[in-house]
Amino acid sequence: MPFRYKRINIENHNKDELKSLDMMLNQNYFYQNKFEEIKKSYLEDRKAQKDPQYLSDPQLRVIVEKYFEKTAWDLLLNYVIGVKETAFYLASSYINGYGVDQDEFLSHLTLAVGVKLGDEKSIKMLDGEETLPAYIQQFADRCIKEIKKHEAEVQNRDVSCEEIMARAKAFDYFVKTNTNHSYYDTIHEKNNASMKHFSYYVEPIIENNSQDHLEPIGESTKCHCEIC
């Protein structure tokens, strides 16, 4: 069945607001498959964090952290459509709380997906560490099936902001209903012009999603990371 989505929460908007919203949602998603640009943003975000002015100026931190949120969102959107290199950086964001709430389960799941997709940095990050729990690895296999479906349906064509946001929310629905952990809910929203803000107006049409719940994560598995 083809992927479908709809617009929501637009009832109280006037004509001009709807026009502006329509322009935003219909435009092509600029960062689709542009991993190097997203990686550059991630590394610039980390550099900004070490700046003495960032550390001492609360107002500057508020401004800069909006960029952390945007980077995390771009990582998620590309992760969902199979850009394997994003897994390491998205997992690192969840380990350290870069633009997201820290979430050990999501960091482990994202790394497991990255390893299974063949991302070298994800593999290196877990090299020599305790093996991730079997239920995370098993669920990662199911996540990859979802990711591969999204990847196949968007390859070789431009994707609108509306569609890719809906796909991210559909993938997150799959994860959340099975694990009670959410990529979408944990990404910060400090910028009312962010894509997460606009995703409030888009909803995937979900049908026949599996809801077999997993056991909560037990013993933690620590990961080493030379960049994050």
UniProtKB/Swiss-Prot annotation:
Name of the protein described by the UniProt record: Uncharacterized protein RP277
